Each structure stands twice: as structure tokens, then as C-alpha cells.
From Swiss-Prot:
This is Rab-like protein 3. GTP binds at G16, V17, G18, K19, S20, S21, K148, F149, D150, D179, C180. Residues 1-233 are annotated as: Small GTPase-like. The lineage of its organism: Eukaryota, Metazoa, Chordata, Craniata, Vertebrata. CDD domains: RabL3. Keywords: GTP-binding, Nucleotide-binding. The keyword Nucleotide-binding applies. It comes from Danio rerio.
Amino acid sequence: MASLDRVKVLVLGDSGVGKSSLVHLLCQNQVLGNPSWTVGCSVDVRVHDYREGTPEEKAFYIELWDVGGSVGSASSVKSTRAVFYNSVNGIILVHDLTNKKSSQNLYRWSLEALSKDSSPTGIIVSNGDYDREQFAENAVPLLLIGTKFDQIPENKRNDVLTRTAFLSEDFNAEEINLDCTNPRYLAAGSSNAVKLSRFFDKVIEKRYFTRDPSQMQSFTDRRRFNFKSLHSD
């Protein structure tokens, strides 16, 4: 295969939420048989057809960087992890739909990846909000993915989906909820597959085709993160 242009997408979230299983499913179209904890960072690649079905269609490599660890790690660990955050073109934020804490921690993960000094714990502002204006120069596309959808009891699903909708609004990102052990959640033509393709197209456009900075939506165009949506039971 001829050499392809590539983009770098971080896959962030707490340990145990299913990032490795998700990346394996996205890149190999197979269920990961024996997932293990990621130490440091693991990278896998998938081929994506940008603007598929149009005259502008072009194949790109999508590098998916599965970053291990936790947001509560010591500063030395965060500093080491910061090397993975260089030259990022997109971020997939992954949380466990059965674990509200993993959803709350996505705010800290995003700040760690996007802050220049990699010390997000120092930029919490009043009323429990994170100030997006501190990242005004960033225009990194985000995608929110909730895992273990199959493990949510039927009588709890509406509450969980309401919570993820607030998350999606906070991050100004589309959301996908799935079960990483079931490839049908990402079947071709499904709404999830369309959202995923749209996200990768956006990442590629920002990296290769956007030249006018005024067209790049910054964090100042979006409202602040609001923890109320996550702390309410």
C-alpha cells in the first residue's frame, strides 16, 4: 500500500473502562479476547476513508494512542505521560457507563492532555467548573464514547443516557454508547459508525484542510464544564 498521510488521536479515560478493547475493535474489527492493563501507551492504526463516497475521498491512517494510568497519578507520572500528548489531532474520551466516577474524570483527562503545563489540578475555578477559556487556542476535535452499555439495567438506562447527554453538551462532542464485546454496535451504516466516521473526517479536516484560524472553533465558543450534570443522582 502506498504511504498515507496520518493523524494522531488520543484515547483517554480511567483504567478499566475498556480503552484497549475499544481500540482493538476499531482497528481490527474484532473483539479483544484477553484485555490487559495498558502500561505507558499502546498505539494501533486503522485506515479511514475521508469523505467516503465523494470525489474528495482519500485514505488516511488514524493512529489511536491508548494512554494508560489514572488522573490521580503523581506529578512525575503525569510529566512522563505528557510526552504522548504532543502533536495531537483528536481525542476520544472513554468512560464506563456503569461507573459515574469515570465520567467525572473525563474533565481532568481532557485538561491534562490539552494544558501546556500538564497540571490540570491547578486550574479548577470557582463553583466546581473548569475554565475552558484557559484553552482558547486549542481546537482539538473530541468524541465521547461510553462503554459497557450492555451492563446497564433496563430501568437505569434513561438516567444514564441523560447524564451522558450532559457530558456530550459540556464537551461539545458527539457521543457513542456501546458494548466493546459486540461489533454490531459499530456495524457499517449504523448511527454509531456514522458518528465515528464524521469524527475522523473532522480530525483530518482540521489537520490537513483548515487554513483559516477563524474557522477553527475554540473552547471559548463553548460554555464551561458543569459538574452538576454528573454529581446529581
